């Protein structure tokens, strides 16, 4: 795996391998590399979990983390992302984890030797989040085949939803969507069925909630926090209708008492904190796969 840009670029075999490696890291597996390796985390949008867990993953792997601050970089002088990455490549950085507000920001960057991990591109995709979600689901159920999964909330503006709906259908899950119809695109019906939230909660094995992404909305939101929670959120009453072994997921950050009742965030059914923990292990697996391939290519070039 040279880069990780989207879930669609991964084969089912590659996905299964990453999930297995993440499980091994969670059980205490150690990674070693032939040479000193370097990573840079380039975040042009705010991030807590993705940024922090990638850095923890890098350090657990023994990878040196190169500091980067977009506001104090030469990009403020007009340097392009390509030329910034060319510089990182020239000084010996192996992999760049990038979050950017622009969808498909990575187009044209693949020809660089430095590896690129997409940490989220606008409303496009978020492959490492999708993989940690898959890891969390597989830990719970052991399979994706036949599972009923709901994706509920601000679907149109969610890169997590974009990644997850495509890969979950590919892996054999049955998908349901819910949330404000104006935040739903009819093209999503190729992946699943749209239903009101009150019909969904009784059906599903996984209730995956999404944050209302106010920063990506062009106008004034027509819902108050209270009205959104009442109409579309996972309230305490709705949660009582979930199947006994159903789990609740959320990519975070969570808006408590908006998409999910405050009391449910750390409830018995919730896997929200587990997702955060699993994020470190899946990102270790991603980085190891990329860095091991770099080592293999370098070895072939010496013959």
Curated annotation (Swiss-Prot):
Give the metabolic or biological pathway: Pyrimidine metabolism; UMP biosynthesis via de novo pathway; (S)-dihydroorotate from bicarbonate: step 2/3
Looking up SUPFAM superfamilies in the UniProt record yields: Aspartate/ornithine carbamoyltransferase
Any one Pfam family here would be OTCace_N
Q: Name one GO molecular function term.
A: aspartate carbamoyltransferase activity
Q: Which GO terms describe its biological process?
A: 'de novo' pyrimidine nucleobase biosynthetic process; 'de novo' UMP biosynthetic process; amino acid metabolic process
Annotated residues that bind carbamoyl phosphate are located at 49-50, 99, 126, 129, 252-253
Q: What is its EC number?
A: 2.1.3.2
Q: Which reaction does it catalyse?
A: carbamoyl phosphate + L-aspartate = N-carbamoyl-L-aspartate + phosphate + H(+)
Binding positions for L-aspartate per the UniProt entry? 77, 159, 211
What are the alphabetically sorted keywords of the record?
Answer: Pyrimidine biosynthesis, Transferase
Q: Which NCBIfam families match?
A: asp_carb_tr, PRK00856.1
Q: How does it assemble?
A: Heterododecamer (2C3:3R2) of six catalytic PyrB chains organized as two trimers (C3), and six regulatory PyrI chains organized as three dimers (R2).
Recorded hits in PANTHER family, A to Z, give: ASPARTATE CARBAMOYLTRANSFERASE (PTHR45753:SF6), ORNITHINE CARBAMOYLTRANSFERASE, MITOCHONDRIAL (PTHR45753)
Q: What does this protein do?
A: Catalyzes the condensation of carbamoyl phosphate and aspartate to form carbamoyl aspartate and inorganic phosphate, the committed step in the de novo pyrimidine nucleotide biosynthesis pathway.
Q: Which family does it belong to?
A: Belongs to the aspartate/ornithine carbamoyltransferase superfamily. ATCase family.
* Name listed for the protein in its UniProt record: Aspartate carbamoyltransferase catalytic subunit
Tell me the lineage of the source organism: Bacteria, Bacillati, Bacillota, Bacilli, Bacillales
The gene for this chain is: pyrB
């Amino acid at each position: 795996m040279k880069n990780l840009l989207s879930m669609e670029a991964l084969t089912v075999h590659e996905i299964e391998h990453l999930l297995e490696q993440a499980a091994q890291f969670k059980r205490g597996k150690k990674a070693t590399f032939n040479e000193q390796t370097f990573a840079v985390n380039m975040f042009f949008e705010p991030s807590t979990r993705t940024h922090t867990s990638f850095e923890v993953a890098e350090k657990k792997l023994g990878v040196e983390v190169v500091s980067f601050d977009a506001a104090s970089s030469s990009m403020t002088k007009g340097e392009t992302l390509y030329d910034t990455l060319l510089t990182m490549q020239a000084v010996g950085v192996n992999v760049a984890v990038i979050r950017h507000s622009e969808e498909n920001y990575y187009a044209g960057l693949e020809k660089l030797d430095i590896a690129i991990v997409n940490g989220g591109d606008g409303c496009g995709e978020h492959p490492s989040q999708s993989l940690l979600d898959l890891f969390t689901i597989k830990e719970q159920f052991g399979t994706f085949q036949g599972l009923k999964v709901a994706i509920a909330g601000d679907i149109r503006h969610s890169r997590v939803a974009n990644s997850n709906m495509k890969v979950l259908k590919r892996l054999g899950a049955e998908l349901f969507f819910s949330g404000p119809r104006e935040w739903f695109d009819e093209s999503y019906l190729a992946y699943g069925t749209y239903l009101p939230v009150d019909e969904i909660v009784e059906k599903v094995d996984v209730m995956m909630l999404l944050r209302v992404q106010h920063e990506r909305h062009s106008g004034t939101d027509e819902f108050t926090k209270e009205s959104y929670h009442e109409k579309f959120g996972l309230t305490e009453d709705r949660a009582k209708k979930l199947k006994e072994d159903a789990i609740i997921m959320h990519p975070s950050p969570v808006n408590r008492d908006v998409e999910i009742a405050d009391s449910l965030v750390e409830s018995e059914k919730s896997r929200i904190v587990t997702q955060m923990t699993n994020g470190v292990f899946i990102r270790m697996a991603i980085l190891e796969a990329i860095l091991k391939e770099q080592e293999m290519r370098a070895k072939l070039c010496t013959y």
